[in-house]
Amino acid sequence: MSRIGLKVINVPESVTVTKNGNEITVKGPKGELTREFDPRIKFEQEDGVIRFSRSNENDKAIHGTMRANLANMIEGVVNGYKKELKLIGVGYRAVAKNNVLTLNVGYSHPVEMKAPEGVTVTTSSATDVTIEGISKQVVGQFAAEIRAVRSPEPYKGKGIRYADEVVRRKEGKTGK
């Protein structure tokens, strides 16, 4: 049984957390994030510590989710989030210009993807893509969308994968 919702969140001095109705805004050195939270969960802030409490046991799941979301928001405005992708395959390459990522991954046409607001896309080499931002959800979602353009296949391992991803390989069919 998870008790994540009961853990307190320590707020760094460089971060301010304000509540306005159901919206919680987190401001930090890297930027500002706002999110609407469920009104069934109570929010208490004192002496740089935030606690969430629920009124009944039926709200356990949303209790832990809200606590994790706020902890991720605080982490994002302090340190930010980063995802790295690798393109593996002959002729596969990526170019980032003006926050538009152009992928050449074996299709008859290049695939262009515009980065969402608050996300920066850079390419350190033709096969390495780095996505950075302050929202864990937006960075992860955009990285997943890029990976879905050409996900790694199990026979040769070609495709777009996360830098730390291990692709399970399959053996090809045997001849007669």
From Swiss-Prot:
Keywords recorded for this protein, A-Z: Ribonucleoprotein, Ribosomal protein, RNA-binding, rRNA-binding
User: What HAMAP family does the record point to?
Assistant: Ribosomal_uL6_B
Query: Mind naming one GO cellular-component term on file for this protein?
Result: cytosolic large ribosomal subunit
Q: Supply the PANTHER family for this chain.
A: 60S/50S RIBOSOMAL PROTEIN L6/L9, LARGE RIBOSOMAL SUBUNIT PROTEIN UL6M
What is stated as this protein's family in its record? Belongs to the universal ribosomal protein uL6 family.
Record field: transmembrane: none
What's the name of the protein? Answer: Large ribosomal subunit protein uL6
* BP-aspect Gene Ontology terms: cytoplasmic translation
Answer whether the UniProt record assigns the keyword Ribonucleoprotein to this protein.
Answer: yes
Which Gene Ontology terms cover its molecular function? rRNA binding; structural constituent of ribosome
